[in-house]
From Swiss-Prot:
GO terms for cellular component: membrane; nuclear envelope. Belongs to the chondromodulin-1 family. Widely expressed with highest expression in tendons and ligaments, in the diaphragm, eye and skeletal muscle. Expressed in neuronal cells of all brain regions. Very low expression, if any, in glial cells. This is Tenomodulin. The gene is Tnmd. It comes from Mus musculus. Glycans are attached at residues 94, 180. The modification Phosphoserine is found at residue 239. Its main location: membrane.
Amino acid sequence: MAKNPPENCEGCHILNAEALKSKKICKSLKICGLVFGILALTLIVLFWGSKHFWPEVSKKTYDMEHTFYSNGEKKKIYMEIDPITRTEIFRSGNGTDETLEVHDFKNGYTGIYFVGLQKCFIKTQIKVIPEFSEPEEEIDENEEITTTFFEQSVIWVPAEKPIENRDFLKNSKILEICDNVTMYWINPTLIAVSELQDFEEDGEDLHFPTSEKKGIDQNEQWVVPQVKVEKTRHTRQASEEDLPINDYTENGIEFDPMLDERGYCCIYCRRGNRYCRRVCEPLLGYYPYPYCYQGGRVICRVIMPCNWWVARMLGRV
């Protein structure tokens, strides 16, 4: 009977050791489960957040057809937007008159391909669509319209030598279209826009080509009028008070102020004034809307003096 207590004590120690060991294992399993649960919850939150808040690139290609009238003719422009490659392709004309304009916002280049010329012209462009802020000052429509030059006229002159190394267009859509034709760099050149001639004097009107294709083929014709304008500009430096005018108000003719306010003619002007504004083509392209295709079109009109219209009706001009 005296040997039983030691044996019982050894059995108790063994049981206590096994219990402590099992408790440690359970505690470790609980800690591992908690860590894995936190990691799984974090991954779920990150996946959900990236799906809902991260801008997903659309794999869809957008096509659009735009119809407009130019010089009385109905024309169409086909636009294709590929968000994956960040390119825009504009197609206009048919046959030899077809023109393709590719805007590569990923690499920062623009390619213009003329099917009739079998040539491709490359120029650099921005890689990010600019954000246009609203104008700070509002234009009062009732104010008198003065001579306004909206912007300096720019022509794109091609380089004399073609592009030999085309590695910079390796991953561009431009190279797919212009791979088998000659490619040239084109650079902007400013043209000094002349002041309008006094319509009381004799003068010739200057006609500039309206299409980019004609401007490329007729670069010399674009430069000649600029030289002529600079030579004759010194003859128009007289002030408004020194210009001759046929004032028919002395004969009892009164002009309605609404003619001036609505832009039909200018009552107090002594020369024709040009008013220009930019019109954007609503092609539903990238933001901001409307999308300005080729920077928009500049539409100008000339506001003549009211006395000039009277003189014209009397046959004096």
